[in-house]
Amino acid sequence: MIADELTYRIRGAFGFPPTAEQEHAISVFTTFMADRHEHAVMILRGSAGTGKTTLAAAIVRAMLSCQQQLVLLAPTGRAAKVFSLYAGTAAYTIHRRIYRQKSLEGGFELGYNNAHDTLFLVDEASMVSLNGEGRSLLDDLISFVYNGRNCRLMLIGDHAQLPPVGEEESPALMSSVLSSYGLKVHESTLSEVLRQSQESGILYNATQVRWLMYDGRCELPKIHLQGFTDVKIVPGDELIETLASSYSKVGLDETMVVTRSNKRANIFNQGIRNQILWREEELCTGDQLMIVKNNYYWIKPPATHSSAGNVAGSSPQQGESEGVSFIANGDMAVVRRVRNIHELYGFRFAEVTMTFPDYDDYELTATVLLDTLTSEAPALTRDQQEQLFTKVMEDYADIPRKSDRMKALKEDRYYNALQVKFAYAATCHKAQGGQWAHIYVDQGYMTDDMLSTDYLHWLYTAFTRATEQLYLVNWPKTQIEEAED
């Protein structure tokens, strides 16, 4: 592929002249694609409002016009859906593309990359972790891609967002980390906020937070309201009315409250269900749920999981709706039917039919554990998990062989019940990768001694989840920039 031809096609896919930074990124990309090094990789960093999304979409369109095979990936289902919408072609979650089910013992292992001459593009790469028990997601992603013949990887992300839990920075966006894998790194960073983005109060204030972060100034940012209609302060006594208005205007699925803790998210979820949606039952039709623990039991994936047949621009043999191989932590679901609520083993369960909006409304009926809905813990605690294990195993005490008892346990619907929470409010890590029309940010009580770079990452990530309207809940006056006379 001739670099000049590719440059011409990318520029043409823009529809308007690229900025100087975008031109440089295009040059880096064409050099990356022309590099004969078999382990070349590219990092494209860009903060909100810098045109990263526009550039990535132009690259996808240009590559497809050249008949180049692509696989678009993202860390979560909602992030994959967003990537698919702006790129104009199918995108998949990383986990569902690179792992396959073990045939006998259950669980998943790294799959085989059948693709060749394929570019893998990963959006929201700031969420890809290096930590983990044994091999990390970044380890497996790199191994999977470069095990394919003449395949290469492009990582796209915003390094101002929250890094993965337990990390100080986002490892997938660090050239030093990628170089340690023996990869030849090409990189480009977009930092200039585009003129049209400066008209957005959401992006203006997110950029102010980003500047504080990179200037090394840990101070409470002042929110600028003057001249913007898309950022508003919501006092506590107006929150119910304002949230109800958002639900009426854009819907439950386009409104999200972002909080700093599971405890706060739980309080908001209960308040929203009781005082706005008037839902008195434990779980109702129409309730929005979030899966809080990976579950491999309820979906039986296909025996083979080839990436070669799932390139962008083709008709995938398995789209996310047809090839959902497991239910992932962070997946969103909508309750369609609730029946047979009952107590067993000291826990409460229900049979729930639900659809998954980020996977073309894939429908599933499963046993759901109700106890996690309102608990302050992220999922079942270790003690609760051990209690459930012990109680279920008692039912199989008549099976003489331990291996057969363990097999029965793995096939037990109660031990494998879905762990869920309500999804009207969530922590920032849970919301990361997704976008909603209306975002409500609850930072809780803040003092100067609570300031840190982590807080600024959190605030920036929370702000940039909003696409239309940002509401700041109970925001202190000391954090609001006074209007100029």
Q: Which stretches of residues belong to each language-model region?
A:
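Conserved pre-motif I regulatory segment
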Residues: 2-40
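Conserved SAM-binding loop
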Residues: 18, 72, 257
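Short, conserved phosphate/pyrophosphate- and ester-handling motifs at nucleotide-, phospho-/glycolipid
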Residues: 22, 76, 261, 433
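ASCE P-loop NTPase helicase motor core
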Residues: 27, 31, 36-219, 224-226
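Short, solvent-exposed amphipathic alpha-helical segments in soluble enzyme
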Residues: 88, 272-275, 456-460
